[in-house]
Regions:
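Glycine- and acidic-residue-biased ligand/ion/polar-headgroup-sensing regions
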Residues: 131-143
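Short acidic-glycine-tyrosine-enriched beta hairpin
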Residues: 150-178
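Conserved short histidine dyad/triad with adjacent acidic residue
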Residues: 114-128, 176-178
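Residue-level recognition of short, solvent-exposed, well-ordered loop/turn junctions
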Residues: 119, 138, 166-168
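N-terminal leader/capping segments at the start of a protein or of a new domain
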Residues: 2-83
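Short beta-strand segments in beta-sandwich/barrel cores
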Residues: 123-124, 140-146
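A short hydrophobic beta-strand segment most commonly corresponding to one strand
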Residues: 134-136, 182, 188-204
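A short glycine-rich, His/Asp/Glu-containing loop-to-beta-strand
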Residues: 91-120
Length: 218
């Protein structure tokens, strides 16, 4: 695959100027936090190490912002150390334009750990996740557009644009539960990302239709 070589450069890209950790809040505000620089650990930081540390972080912190800020360094540590993860993905489906490969599945395990690919030019719906989330870009370029709720008496699901951000390999973005965004793979390369999500509240997860100022659960 022509895009497989792109993900191998992630650990180097993460050290370069310009890469960053981003956080999108429920209010549609985007801010940078922490450092994108991380050294390879002296011993291999395996997936089970990451999952153990992830459980500890979730037990320690209860709010979305604190959880994202605590977990992003763990994600960077994992991706720098366990190179095999950067190759564990499926090519996008010709029908949908995207593909998902789960990295860890266990009976009643509540979190989602997966690799996601999008073919160039494929957009997502405008949506929130109903839980906190973290996306680390490994290959390609991904445009993120952001919104916030702007409820009106007759249109409780009205939203308004708050900006956009272009993610490059080495960038990581986190979301709070009601942060609203849409993504699109741009350029010539398939977008490859490591995605991590908390426990989804399906009663709070929506895709939005700004033209009609409506939304629906999904």
């Amino acid at each position: 695959m022509p895009y497989r070589s792109a993900v191998l450069a992630w650990s180097l890209m993460a050290q370069m100027m310009g890469n960053a950790n981003w956080l999108l809040t429920d209010e549609g505000e985007l801010r940078q936090f922490g450092s994108a620089d991380i050294e390879s650990p002296p011993q291999v930081y395996r997936l089970y190490h990451f999952l153990t540390d992830l459980d500890a972080a979730l037990e320690k912190f209860e709010d979305d912002v604190s959880r994202v800020e605590a977990i992003v360094p763990l994600v960077r540590k994992l991706l720098v150390s366990s190179y095999w993860l950067q190759m564990e993905y499926d090519p996008p489906s010709p029908k949908t334009g995207w593909a998902v490969k789960f990295l860890y599945r266990e009976y009643q395990y509540p979190l989602t750990v997966q690799m996601v690919t999008w073919q160039p030019g494929t957009p997502s719906t405008i949506h929130n996740h109903g839980t906190w989330g973290i996306v680390a870009l490994l290959g390609g370029q991904e445009r993120n557009r952001f919104w916030r709720r702007a409820a009106e008496p007759k249109h409780p699901y009205n939203i308004e644009s708050t900006g956009e951000l272009l993610l490059n390999p080495g960038d990581v973005i986190g979301f709070t539960s009601d942060a609203i965004h849409a993504i699109e793979s741009i350029g010539d390369e398939t977008t490859v990302s490591f995605n991590l999500y908390g426990i989804t509240n399906y009663d709070r997860r929506y895709k939005f239709h700004p033209e009609s100022r409506t939304a629906e659960k999904f």
